[in-house]
Amino acid sequence: MNKKLNLLKKRISIIIRDKNRKGFFKIFKEIIHFWIIKKEVPYFYFGKFLYRKEISNYCDYLSSKEVDRITLSKNLHKYQYSSILRNKLSFALYMEENNLPVPKIVCFNYKNRFYYNSNILSINSEDELFTFIQKILQERSLKKIFIKSITGMGGEGCFLLSEENLKIEIQKYAREILSQESIFQNVVDQHLEVNKVYPHSLNTIRFDTFIDKNNTIHILSAFMRFGCGGSFVDNGSSGGIYLSVDLDTGKLKGNSHQLMKYGGKQLEKHPDTNFVFESFEIPYFQESKDLIKKAVSYLPDRIIGWDIAISKDGPIIIEGNDNNSFITPDIAYGGYLKHPLFKEILEEA
């Protein structure tokens, strides 16, 4: 309860201090209108920054009911696809089986049971885990290894272990690693141009795809995420920032966005590197779009959010999500309901 109250106080403080805020009377008027139109308490009005001066089309943003209508739709989502998408191990194995590029699987674990090179090992202590990871790094000639929860979301349950600091990192993360189910993968060698923006995290592009009733695959939108403050994850729910991407040119556009609980800042430059976002052209962008459409043909759930990384050799699929909250893409697009296909999506839901 105290955590929720503190979060509410922080949000109120951010709204009051926001120099780009509309007048309180206008905000109140729009809240009532949004409430009537959407038929629900308009908490998304603040969470999606619809109180800011540049937002005049606030009713074009999805309500929680509209999001639930899409994400819970049995017409748009099928269990046989979502069961693969929601299990990161199954997803990576399925992609590998169909020769679609994903970070190479090294091993995986179910709590203290580890599966490596067709062997099952029981690991029950920090020392045993250290010895095991050290062995993997040496046998695979790896400097780092990335670990993520098989069912986690939003950067939760992710760890980056390095040969250089392995002892310290194992002491810090062993308890969590041994208490969850994880997939261990090679670290992607990120493209140098993307590293110029922020080098400490794997910065991914989120593509939303939709298969219409004629089985045509559409890319609805794209935005790119970057980590901040030394973080090795780029997720907005972990404090990262994100920007809209022009689907035709592959260039970043506008200022960055950030979730309100992390300050909701709008920036022209990355806060750590001072790299100017506007018009940065993403390498291998056309290849990324082609890869996404190919991936959809192998996993034809009708709406998926795909995360794509850009390596020095081309795009790599990180994961797909059928249970998209649509908060970040809705903000990045500037109101998803103005998209020409969203009327059809809601009708099909």
Question: How should each PLM-predicted stretch be described?
Answer:
Residues 7-135, 292:
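Conserved N-proximal alpha/beta basic substrate-recognition cap immediately N-terminal to
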Residues 142-144, 202-206, 219, 303-305, ...:
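Extracellular structured ligand-interaction cores
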Residues 88-205, 210-213:
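Active-site nucleotide/adenylate-binding loops and adjacent lid/helix of ATP-dependent enzymes
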Residues 148, 185, 223, 319-323:
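Active-site ExK catalytic segment of metal-dependent nucleases
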Residues 193-196, 293-295, 304-307:
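Generic recognition of flexible, low-complexity loop/linker segments
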Residues 197-198, 202-287:
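ATP-dependent carboxylate/phosphate-activation module, predominantly the ATP-grasp catalytic core
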Residues 265-290, 294-301, 310-349:
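C-terminal active-site "lid" helix and adjoining low-complexity regulatory extension at the edge
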